[in-house]
Amino acid sequence: ATDGDADRIGVIDDKGNFLHPNDILVLLYYYLVKFKGWHGPVVRNIATTHMLDKVAEQFGEKCYEVPVGFKYVSAKMQETGAIIGGESSGGLTVHGHINGKDGIYAAALLIEMLAVTGKKLSQIMDDIHAECGEIHMEERDYKFTLEKKLKMQEVLMEQKQLPDLPEEIDHVSYLDGSKVYFKNGGWVIARFSGTEPLLRIFCEMPDAVEAADICTRYE
């Protein structure tokens, strides 16, 4: 199914589970490289799964990170020659197609992938995890008033405060929100939505329980 303007898709897999847009991106990048023989990097925004990094590394490619906003994805794709780029909110495009998001094209490419591989979506995801490893994402949204937003901005972006986190920190980026990169490969980002009065927390860790725990620490 697509959204109203058909620039994003929603997918239910063969087991009846909703396929997260992160997984759609991972599946299509894996398909383009492994089965279609394409070569090139991938582009994702700062809040999108690092499974793309793992798949890229597996095939000797690179993953580029950009701020949230599809214009940044498109620009980086043109700059680097990336073969696919997208965001965890559901938009993606492929090299040689349009520079904007296209849900119908993405759906057609998924169907092509199923036909070419002869496998179900869940089976291909299992193959990816077996080859590239697995990480778990937790997402939280928090509503706020304008007064609360100003206070949170001060704490996160000006004072650069962080909660007590259980993993050793590699570095912190303020490219778009406050993103902590852990030495174990995990990460967590706190950023304000550009379209809704929400503070969004995304965390991805090797362990699902720890990802949920880290999100809770931001409360």
Task: Pin down the residues of each PLM region.
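Phosphate-binding and adjacent anionic-ligand microenvironments
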Residues: W38-E219
